[in-house]
Amino acid sequence: MLGALKWFFGLGLVAVIGISAGVYFAFFGAGPQITYVTPDLVPIDLNTAAPSDRPPVNLPTAVVLRVPFTTQAPLGNWADRQHTCEEASLLMVDRYLRGDHSTGKIDAQTADRGINQITAWKPAVDLEIHQIGAVAKKYMGWADEVMPATRLAMKQQLALGRPLIVGVRTHGLGNANYPGFRTHFEDTGWSVSHYLVVVGYDTSDSFILNDPGISKGHGWHIKYDQLMHAIDDLVHAYPNLNAGRVFLVLAPFTNSSK
């Protein structure tokens, strides 16, 4: 918890409380209007049989969590930030859990400081998803769970107010804004291992991403099958990072058995 007490990066020490449910509206440039349907954040109960930790029986038709965004190179220094997607993903989720529900971009200097701090905490340059959870637990004080990436499980966790961190291979996402997408599609060195944040799903059954790997990764919509392809592509191309079709959730923790 000592690391968690030091973790503030412009937010100050913020008490973790339930995120109030509500409906909000926002625009991203010339893109479609996004409706933020924000459920209460449910802590992860260390007592796994606790009813408070169970997902709702009737899922909302759409959930979009108000998670702030940063790229992994907030100052534009992409050449030096090729391996900081884990940091950027953790930073976005951590700020959301601590009460930053701005949905816009995190201040670039603040984001850069946060990324540098998490880099200092990482045990290796590239992390497997369980290691990302361990960093969040040790230094940020969050409970962590790695879960199978089924369509239902992803929606259930989002309905509990929890963003998802997912490992993928970049070109598998189908986002043509990625370098080399049109000329070197899924070639080694162009399509690379990557982590991003799933912040919601919409009424058309698309999932919504905060993807730190490109400047145009904020609010990217992707179908479930496409996302699974990107996960499978990571599994095949980077066996050292192979965790299968899974995602990571972070949240405050409680223990109802005490």
What is each of the regions a protein language model found here?
Residues L2-H130, T170-G172, N177-F181, T203, ...:
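Active-site-adjacent structural segments surrounding the nucleophilic cysteine of cysteine proteases
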